[in-house]
Amino acid sequence: MKKFVTLLLCMLPVSLFAQVNDGIRQAMDNYDYETVVMLIEPDCQDSLLLITKAQALKAMNRYPEAIGVLNSLILKDSTNTKVLIDLAECYKLTGNSRRAANCYQKAMNLQPENKFFRLQFIRSLLASEDYEEARTACHGWLERDSLSATGYKYLGQAYEGLQDAASAFLSYNIAYRRDSLDAQTVARIAGIFNNNQQFKDAVDVTEVYRLSDTTNIDVNRQNAKAYCMLKEYGTAVKRYESLKELGDRSFLTLYYLGVSHYGDNWFYGAYDNLKEAYQKNPMDVNVLYYLAKASARTSWKKEGVEYMEEAFRIAVPSDSMMVRLYDGLVECYDYAGDTKLSLIHI
């Protein structure tokens, strides 16, 4: 009898533990994350339960707590790639791309052939604007796989971040030759063409892409902008209206649609879109300029005067600002030892 009681007492904690585990599993299956966190003891040392707790915290957007749990697991086992990736994702979701990159790099060092880890590492570097390190990482990728269109695409982004437009274009061009249907690559190439005022080239490359897909927002933005800059306002209006139908109500889409309507002599359409762009960025002088001119040609003529006056107030520095700028200029000349120029500006 004594042995039976002892055996029963030994089995009791095991039974309770199994019940708790079943409860946690059921709560996870039912997306009841609060219950999951509640059922797992604060001082729990079980790695599987802690991973489950971190997943529940992450699902509730409680990222700092999830990060704390995952870091405690990394201290126990720094080679667990699943925990490293979960930790990287939590850092990304808190906007800390640099720390996310560090986690992806550790996972990548553990599994050098894993393309996902390498891809996420480079993306995180680009997101954190560590362009030089991203460039180096891309070259490392391309040493392993010289045919990778994605590798060249991200190399182009790294060069863009480094303000090296020529190398960026060369990288995008190689990526495009390997995969001409990658929307991001097409949009980036078209963006460089537009920035260089090669608007016809931007139209050509985007129209080729549009033969297979007319719904990509990034490609259509560059396509529409090129038509607007070429003063083909009718086509630009169609493209920008299509973008709005796709849900794009960004500042630049509204601004360029307004400008295109203005160029196409539909001033009410120009007014409506420029007014919406103005509400998003009331300090933009270009928006105020076209909004004023559109207003003057519609029923809102007094508004037109007010908008143009506002543009003047923003564009022309006040007297006090000019005095401050001149004082600063004189000070800089003095420090540079250029007394003659300093006296001229006093």
PLM ranges: what are they?
Residues 16-71, 75-82, 93, 102:
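N-terminal leader/linker segments that initiate helical-solenoid repeat arrays
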Residues 29, 59, 93-94, 127-128, ...:
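Register position in tetratricopeptide repeats
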Residues 39, 43, 72-73, 106-107, ...:
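Canonical positions in the second alpha-helix
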Residues 48, 82, 116, 150, ...:
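Start-of-helix register in tetratricopeptide repeats
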Residues 52, 86, 120-123, 154, ...:
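Canonical tetratricopeptide repeat
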Residues 344-346:
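Conserved small/polar residues in nucleotide/adenosyl-binding loops
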